[in-house]
């Protein structure tokens, strides 16, 4: 069966051999703001005066938007990543499979809807994850749904329906395939039978599409001694940059190398490479608490190699942020600021000689005496933000400030007086809840036929008052990052451009002394570790 890719639209369709007249589409700009799908496509051949012809030997097909929408033929449109050759190749393979009649297979693992796509011969090609079937989403096929797109999800700093763009963002940020993230795209798939709560299948769905990676195990089935230091370091470097909130053993695939047998690999003899997948819970809207499964693995304590240090040194957080603005301009600016802060922290920490484990520790919150305390990175950001919004940059004594921070770190818990310390915080650190849903949520909600009146737009004042009555007052930030029983994060999206510049200046002034004056306290236990030791 012949399938072609149109260079203007990245759409695929079967050839129509009944017509030799080409119907051309006007060149419109794709709306990366996710995807305002109501954009009308112009069919220049609609005019009777249009006599544009190709060679009569070339079978032409209609790429008219109206014809595609009215046709029951499966097809795919690339919405994000279309400039990347590996993405276009992946989508071409998947398109050939689905127009040949391949059916998506729902995978039993995981909380969300993930579908395996195969060729006619049964070879695995890719895994598709519709955004309306994410964990907690209203169309979840595994009974864990109920929320509309745009509401806070499993992590309060990442909204339901926004995991797909983060999957693509992680791939775009993996320069030269350094961390081995599989090719990933964001696509609109039409007339393919995914799960739908209604009696009829939806005409189309937006989904992330990631190339399937053949593997022997996941990291949870082996002890960490089986993995190469290089693989652990490269995954860790990516996780730190994007502040991965969910790097557990199940989303690191294990590939044996050097033709090792299963017994050798499972006994921890030799080496195995890791492939990271599932990046839907990275780039949160605020500085949240990450989870790094590798934090206590011995490989993470090994110093970085010269190649790794050179790669880290060459990272440009501002160019990375601009890349995501270009490819995914619907991603929140606050998430891009998290990327910038974490990348700067990684670069400075690596240059100061810290290992991956030490860097991860300083980004991770600790639990002491049943209470969760702020991470070193959060403390730094809170102080830098307070300095920026108050405009007292020039008068700050950075050395004395960091001495106070070190004293707080020794205690392990931050207990402040509600009536004194909290009132001294600048008003801008206590900003209200979002009064509207970001544009991506609105567009996707419309796409999935979610009534706008179901979007989250109010805040439970009773919950807020209860939080204020608690004796343990934690770092103030944007309330969208607050779960009822979770610690708040540091929110950067409420700062103006000038304040953001002042924040970065203050942050970079505080950072060297913070890294120099703090020492690793050794590995600390992490709940949920699934690897053998």
Curated annotation (Swiss-Prot):
Region (Activation loop): 276-302
Signal peptide range in chain numbering: none
Superkingdom assignment: Eukaryota
Region G-loop: start-end pairs: 107-113
Domain PI3K/PI4K catalytic: 101-397
Record-linked InterPro entries: P4KG1-8, PI3/4_kinase_cat_dom
Keyword Heme among record annotations: no
Chain residues that bind ATP: 108-114, 129, 210-213, 278
Alphabetical list of Pfam families matching this protein: PI3_PI4_kinase
Keywords from the named record: ATP-binding, Kinase, Nucleotide-binding, Transferase
GO molecular function: 1-phosphatidylinositol 4-kinase activity; ATP binding
Catalytic loop as annotated region, ranges: 243-251
Alphabetized PROSITE patterns for the sequence: PI3_4_KINASE_3
EC number: 2.7.1.67
Catalysed reactions listed for this entry: a 1,2-diacyl-sn-glycero-3-phospho-(1D-myo-inositol) + ATP = a 1,2-diacyl-sn-glycero-3-phospho-(1D-myo-inositol 4-phosphate) + ADP + H(+)
Role: The phosphorylation of phosphatidylinositol (PI) to PI4P is the first committed step in the generation of phosphatidylinositol 4,5-bisphosphate (PIP2), a precursor of the second messenger inositol 1,4,5-trisphosphate (InsP3).
PANTHER family in alphabetical order: PHOSPHATIDYLINOSITOL 4-KINASE GAMMA (PTHR45800), PHOSPHATIDYLINOSITOL 4-KINASE GAMMA 8 (PTHR45800:SF21)
Family stated for the protein in its record: Belongs to the PI3/PI4-kinase family. Type II PI4K subfamily.
Protein name: Phosphatidylinositol 4-kinase gamma 8
Organism: Arabidopsis thaliana (Mouse-ear cress)
Gene: PI4KG8
């Amino acid at each position: 069966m012949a399938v072609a890719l149109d260079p203007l639209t990245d759409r695929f369709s079967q050839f129509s051999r009944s017509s030799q007249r080409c119907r051309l589409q006007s060149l419109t700009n794709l709306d990366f703001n996710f995807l305002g799908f109501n954009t009308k496509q112009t069919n220049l051949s609609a005019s009777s005066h249009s006599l544009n012809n190709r060679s009569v030997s070339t079978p032409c097909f209609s790429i008219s938007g109206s014809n595609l929408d009215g046709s029951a033929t499966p097809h795919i449109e690339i919405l994000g990543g279309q400039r990347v050759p590996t993405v276009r190749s992946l989508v071409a393979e998947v398109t050939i499979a689905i127009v040949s009649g391949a059916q998506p297979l729902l995978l039993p693992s995981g909380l969300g809807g993930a579908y395996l796509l195969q060729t006619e011969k049964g070879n695995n090609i890719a895994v598709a994850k519709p955004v309306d079937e994410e964990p907690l989403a209203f169309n979840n096929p595994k009974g864990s749904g109920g929320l509309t797109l745009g509401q806070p999800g499993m992590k309060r700093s990442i909204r339901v329906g926004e995991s797909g763009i983060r999957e693509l963002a992680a791939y775009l940020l993996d320069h030269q395939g350094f961390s081995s993230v599989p090719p990933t795209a964001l696509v609109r798939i039409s007339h393919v039978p995914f799960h739908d709560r209604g009696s009829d299948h939806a005409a189309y769905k937006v989904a992330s599409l990631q190339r399937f990676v053949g593997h022997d195990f996941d990291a949870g089935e082996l002890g960490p001694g089986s993995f190469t230091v290089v693989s652990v370091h490269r995954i860790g470097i990516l996780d730190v940059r994007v502040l991965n909130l969910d790097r557990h053993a199940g989303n690191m695939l294990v590939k044996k190398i050097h033709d090792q047998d299963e017994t050798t690999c499972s006994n921890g003899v030799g080496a195995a490479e890791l492939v990271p997948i599932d990046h839907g819970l990275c780039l949160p809207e605020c500085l949240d608490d990450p989870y790094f499964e590798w934090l206590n693995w011995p490989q993470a304590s090994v110093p970085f190699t010269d190649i790794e240090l050179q790669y880290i040194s060459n990272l440009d957080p501002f160019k990375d942020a601009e890349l995501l603005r270009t490819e995914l301009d619907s991603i929140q600016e606050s998430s891009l600021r998290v990327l910038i802060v974490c990348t700067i922290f990684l670069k400075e920490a690596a240059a100061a000689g810290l290992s991956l484990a030490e860097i991860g520790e300083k980004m991770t919150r600790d639990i002491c005496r049943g209470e969760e305390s702020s991470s070193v990175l959060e403390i730094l950001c809170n102080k830098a933000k307070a300095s920026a919004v108050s405009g007292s940059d020039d008068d700050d004594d950075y050395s004395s400030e960091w001495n106070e921070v070190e004293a707080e770190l020794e205690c392990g818990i931050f207990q402040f007086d509600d009536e004194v310390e909290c009132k001294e915080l600048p008003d801008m650190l206590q900003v209200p809840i979002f009064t509207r849903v970001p544009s991506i949520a609105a567009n996707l909600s419309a796409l999935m036929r979610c009534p706008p009146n179901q979007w989250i737009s109010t805040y439970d004042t009773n919950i807020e008052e209860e939080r204020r009555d608690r004796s343990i007052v934690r770092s103030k930030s944007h309330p969208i990052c607050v779960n009822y029983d979770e610690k708040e994060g540091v929110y950067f999206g409420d700062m103006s451009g000038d304040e953001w510049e002042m924040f970065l200046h203050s942050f970079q002034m505080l950072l060297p002394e913070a890294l120099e004056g703090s020492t690793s306290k050794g590995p600390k236990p992490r709940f949920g570790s699934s690897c053998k030791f």
